[in-house]
């Protein structure tokens, strides 16, 4: 049975995973949601206006009232810079399974922040929420995301053809990864 805890603050060696705040809107826009290099790996298009980002962040904040909502802003400890987001979603209470997704601003790619955030959320999911399985997917054009998933202990489970259609109206194949609670606790 899933122990829903909402979006609890999580700290790692270099990061603070915390709730989004209204004051984050400009940085969310500037650091990843308006950047096509990041949005090319997401299902949704890059934001053209801060108003789009504002609407999205306000919706996230309004969902924090639910214990079943787990969406973190990723902040660096060293300079309090907001660099990305990560969330657990699509909970199946029958199986105890869910999915995870994340976005990191381009400036912070290849510095280990995605891996560090994902490891922390996987730990939170298994240790505190009693999840059975956490799954993730990345499009085949983004193998760096698969590397993050593997470093967090996930294993490749397959490829789903044309799993998503991106903002450029292109179908993308996605690689599926997963990690089971029992495997997490073996390591």
Regions found by a protein language model. Give the residues of each.
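Short, surface-exposed helix-loop/turn micro-motifs enriched in polar/charged residues
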Residues: 44-45, 66, 96
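Short, conserved alpha-helical segments within structured domains
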Residues: 45-49, 70, 141
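A short helix-loop-beta-strand connector motif used in the catalytic cores of GNAT acetyltransferases and
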Residues: 60-73
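Hydrophobic residues in alpha-helical segments
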Residues: 32, 42, 64-65
């Amino acid at each position: 049975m899933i122990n829903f805890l909402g979006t609890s603050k999580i700290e790692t060696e270099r990061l603070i995973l915390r709730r989004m705040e209204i004051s984050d809107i400009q940085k969310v826009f500037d650091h990843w949601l308006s950047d096509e290099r990041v949005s090319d790996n997401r299902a949704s298009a890059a934001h053209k206006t801060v108003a789009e980002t504002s609407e999205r962040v306000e919706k996230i904040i309004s969902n924090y009232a639910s214990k079943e909502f787990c969406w973190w802003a990723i902040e660096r400890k060293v300079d309090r810079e907001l660099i990305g987001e990560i969330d657990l979603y699509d909970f199946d209470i029958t199986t105890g399974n869910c999915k995870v997704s994340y976005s990191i601003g381009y400036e912070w790619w290849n510095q280990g922040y995605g891996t560090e955030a994902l490891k922390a959320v996987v730990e939170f999911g298994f240790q505190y929420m009693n999840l059975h399985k956490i799954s993730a997917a990345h499009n085949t054009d983004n193998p760096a995301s698969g590397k993050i998933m593997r470093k967090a202990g996930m294993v490749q489970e397959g490829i789903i053809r044309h799993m998503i259609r991106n903002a450029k109206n292109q179908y993308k194949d996605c690689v599926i990864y997963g990690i089971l609670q029992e495997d997490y606790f073996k390591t």
